[in-house]
């Protein structure tokens, strides 16, 4: 939110400079993002009046003027602005004036005519970007007055970040309340005198959705001049808040919005048929908005309608049909309290974000509407004329927010703050904040003010007391606690250790959103139902991820589109799997996943360009599994996964339980995702691996190891891992190593079979093995393979 410092000081004016004020606001929890002067640095510019205005004899686009600046004579000034005319009060830079950019005004001749100054536009004074013409001042602007003084340009715009819980500070009144409390000053509110009804005109108002709209006020104002100019003082206040002046009616409602934080809307009364009905939209109902776009409404969208059609989206945006235009003479002013839940998410659904919806979503003071209506009525009549009818108030007390009594205990206050604040100070702070306070023994009973939706529980009151007391005033004290050194189980494998290993292997860690595109996720996990968000950031981020692959593959595409073809990335994070047996019907699993693509090695003059394959990723994965001490218990089994290539993928099993997948991305998926070349992925359920096997020390044999190689022929569908596992079971104490070093298919091996060449390493820790023992062990191994897999020794 952006506002004028001088406007704030009209409400409360502490004796501190701008920098101190900004720091004070920040320390109060309203972070100041910036403080900027409202105008450039200049001097020598005064209010003047164009007494004469004639066409320049030598230039079609210039005019020769005589300007009264309050001196002993009129100044001759040449001006090229299209709006220059006789009788206009203007901003005049006299000779010797210095404008922003160190531009000095001197006497000169323009196309043969003398010019003793300059008539200035807003842009030339550094006030705004408007350079369409010279500044037009009110007819009563005092001639000769310094323009900085007249327009109050010695001012700053202060921009603050208002957190969602402090919706009360989305108006000058809310910020002023905080500044008043912090400086122990009274709040000087503008006098708002009720405007009595001078006509009896009303419109019938019916509220059919009291839960969504507990309070609705309407008032007819007839005979207004919508073309009346908005006063310069109001335009300037709006401009300094970042709001562009549109017309007097809209400017008045915007002014009340910025001043009091209450959104308002004006309807063209003559376009309303029958009366006002506040209801939920009908399914499929449409509304043409003020910006000309057509919105298709849902049944949960609140609308303001007449007896035939929707006129506006309640609390969000007005409709084109009932909007105020140049022909409008009679208006209906609307001022309402809409429930935050009835507005939240509705604007985003239609791609909208308005000042009104921003405030209603966070909560508007439910007792503010009468004050805002009277303020807007008075301003509208003062500027546009007209006569006001009575205020029609439709209020459902049962659905208005209720203010609960909150108990603040002395023990809780001292414990959370860590400092004792005197009872009378606590009481004073709460009352200055607007709370109704009843003191008790070692406690306070407080009722929060209507504008503070965020004060609901005891901790909220503690926060408010500490904030107003001043965090800087709470002394630093050492923590009074005993620190117990924690122990670390040797069996716990740190995920950080695994990340370090992957980093050493050239992988980079990434963090992707848990919110993913449901369409892309369905490509990776077809037929699996994901958890959908009720209020997503965007349609492309509306589902919770079922695996980390969705985000990782999107990251690969992002990098490939930026000429990064060799990618090695990994991520650890939660996946969200629907599970009726889990709490709330959703299971959260910690996963570790990775992706590689491109060349095996970085580009090098002495290395051939080789693309990564299944065994590159499998090898990296085995290094990770080796850290767990369970690599020998892990099996890679051929198992279908719709996201992976059926012939180049595997499921990973640990002790018979599946813990993940590894493989090449399915060619069809690769095409749909626009992946460039072969891409390989893996994913592991980390919690099933985190409890590692503690290494056991064993004696290193001093006796020679013996290697024997065998080649066995088995059916094509027999996994090599099963063959190796069976070999390890034979001669457990003597077979210290089993490795597959060749796979052969072709001449000499029947079709549908393969030859596996296996090396057996045999060794004993107490003696040198005899040849007979070695041969017996090898024979035993061959026999076991023959019995289980119908294997035969290859000739």
UniProtKB/Swiss-Prot annotation:
- List each copy of the FDX-ACB domain by range: 701-794
Question: Where found in the cell?
Answer: Cytoplasm
Checking Pfam families in the record gives: B3_4, B5, FDX-ACB, tRNA_bind, tRNA_synthFbeta
Cofactor binding summary note? Binds 2 magnesium ions per tetramer.
Residues in tRNA-binding domain copies: 39-148
EC? 6.1.1.20
Is Transferase there in the keyword field?
A: no
Which segments constitute the B5 domain? 401-476
Binding of Mg(2+): at which residues?
454, 460, 463-464
Chemical reaction(s) catalysed? tRNA(Phe) + L-phenylalanine + ATP = L-phenylalanyl-tRNA(Phe) + AMP + diphosphate + H(+)
Please give the PROSITE patterns that the UniProt record associates with this protein.
B5 (PS51483), FDX_ACB (PS51447), TRBD (PS50886)
Q: Which cofactor does it need?
A: Mg(2+)
Keywords recorded for this protein, A-Z = Aminoacyl-tRNA synthetase, ATP-binding, Cytoplasm, Ligase, Magnesium, Metal-binding, Nucleotide-binding, Protein biosynthesis, RNA-binding, tRNA-binding
Which NCBIfam families did the record assign? pheT_bact, YtpR
Q: How does the annotation summarize its subunit structure? A: Tetramer of two alpha and two beta subunits.
Its family remark reads: Belongs to the phenylalanyl-tRNA synthetase beta subunit family. Type 1 subfamily.
Under what name is this protein listed? Phenylalanine--tRNA ligase beta subunit
Which classification does the entry list for the species? Bacteria, Pseudomonadati, Pseudomonadota, Gammaproteobacteria, Enterobacterales
The record's gene field reads: pheT
């Amino acid at each position: 939110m952006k506002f004028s410092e001088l406007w704030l000081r009209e409400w409360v004016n502490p004796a501190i400079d701008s920098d101190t004020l900004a720091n004070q606001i920040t320390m109060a929890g309203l972070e100041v993002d910036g403080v900027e002067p409202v105008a450039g640095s200049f001097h020598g510019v005064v209010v003047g009046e164009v007494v004469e205005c004639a066409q320049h004899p030598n230039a079609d686009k210039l005019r020769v003027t005589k300007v009264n600046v309050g001196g002993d004579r009129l100044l001759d000034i040449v001006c090229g602005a299209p709006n220059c005319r006789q009788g206009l009060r203007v901003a005049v830079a006299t000779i010797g004036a210095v404008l922003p950019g160190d531009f000095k005004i001197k006497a000169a001749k323009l196309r043969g005519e003398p010019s003793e100054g300059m008539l200035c536009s807003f842009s030339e004074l550094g006030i705004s970007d408007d350079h369409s013409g010279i500044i037009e001042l009110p007819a009563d602007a005092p001639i000769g007055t310094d323009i900085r003084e007249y327009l109050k340009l010695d001012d700053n715009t202060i921009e603050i970040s208002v957190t969602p819980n402090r919706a009360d500070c989305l108006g000058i009144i809310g910020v002023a309340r905080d500044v008043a409390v912090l400086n122990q000053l009274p709040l000087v509110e503008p006098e708002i005198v009720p405007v009595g009804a001078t006509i009896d005109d009303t419109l019938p108002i019916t509220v059919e959705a009291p839960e969504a709209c507990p309070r609705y006020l309407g008032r007819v104002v007839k005979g207004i001049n919508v073309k009346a100019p908005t006063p310069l003082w109001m335009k300037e206040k709006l401009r300094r808040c970042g709001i562009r002046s549109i017309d007097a009616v809209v400017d008045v409602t915007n002014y009340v919005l910025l001043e009091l934080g209450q959104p308002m809307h004006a309807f063209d009364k003559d376009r309303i048929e029958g009366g006002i009905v506040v209801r939920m939209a009908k399914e499929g109902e449409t509304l043409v908005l003020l910006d000309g776009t057509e919105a298709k409404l849902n049944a949960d969208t609140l609308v303001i309608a007449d007896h035939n059609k929707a006129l506006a989206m309640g609390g969000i945006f007005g409709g084109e049909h009932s909007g105020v235009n140049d022909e409008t003479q009679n208006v209906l002013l609307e001022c309402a309290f809409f429930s935050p839940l009835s507005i939240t998410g509705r604007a985003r659904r239609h791609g909208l974000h308005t000042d009104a919806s921003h405030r209603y979503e966070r909560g508007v003071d439910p007792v503010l509407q009468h004050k805002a209506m009277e303020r807007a009525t008075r301003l509208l009549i003062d500027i546009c004329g007209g006569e006001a009818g009575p205020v029609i108030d439709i209020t459902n007390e049962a659905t208005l927010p209720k203010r609960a009594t909150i108990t603040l205990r002395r023990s809780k206050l001292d414990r959370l703050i860590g400092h004792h604040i005197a009872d009378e100070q606590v009481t004073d702070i709460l009352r200055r904040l607007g709370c109704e306070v009843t003191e008790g023994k070692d406690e306070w009973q407080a009722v929060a003010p209507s504008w503070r939706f965020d004060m609901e529980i005891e901790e909220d009151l503690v926060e408010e007391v500490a904030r107003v007391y001043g965090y800087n005033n709470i002394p630093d004290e050492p923590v009074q606690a005993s620190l117990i050194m924690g122990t670390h189980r040797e069996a716990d494998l740190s995920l950080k250790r695994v990340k370090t290993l992957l980093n050493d292997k050239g992988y980079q860690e990434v963090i992707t959103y848990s919110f993913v595109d449901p369409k892309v996720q369905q490509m990776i996990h077809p037929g699996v139902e994901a958890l959908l968000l009720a209020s997503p950031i965007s349609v492309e981020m509306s589902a919770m991820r079922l695996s980390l692959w969705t985000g990782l593959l999107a990251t690969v595409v992002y990098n490939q589109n930026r000429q990064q073809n060799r990618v090695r990335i990994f991520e650890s994070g939660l996946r969200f799997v629907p599970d009726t047996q889990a709490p709330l019907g959703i299971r959260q699993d910690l996963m570790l996943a990775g992706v590689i693509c491109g060349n095996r090695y970085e580009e090098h003059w002495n290395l051939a360009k080789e693309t990564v394959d299944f065994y590159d990723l499998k090898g990296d994965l085995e290094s990770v599994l080796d850290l767990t001490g369970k690599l020998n218990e892990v099996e890679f089994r051929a198992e279908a996964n719709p996201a992976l290539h059926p012939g180049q993928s595997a499921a990973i099993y640990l002790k018979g339980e599946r813990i993940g997948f590894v493989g090449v991305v399915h060619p069809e998926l690769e095409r749909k995702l626009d992946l460039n070349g072969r891409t390989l992925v893996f994913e592991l359920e980390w919690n099933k691996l985190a409890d590692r096997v503690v290494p056991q020390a064993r004696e290193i044999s001093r006796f020679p190891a013996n290697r024997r190689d065998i080649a066995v022929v088995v059916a094509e569908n027999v996994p090599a891992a099963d063959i190796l596992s069976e070999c390890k079971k034979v001669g457990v104490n003597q077979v210290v190593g089993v490795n597959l070093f060749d796979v052969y298919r072709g001449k000499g091996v029947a079709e549908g079979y393969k030859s596996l060449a296996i090396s057996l390493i045999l060794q004993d820790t107490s003696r040198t093995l005899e040849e007979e023992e070695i041969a017996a062990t090898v024979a035993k191994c061959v026999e076991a393979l023959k019995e289980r897999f119908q294997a035969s020794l290859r000739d």
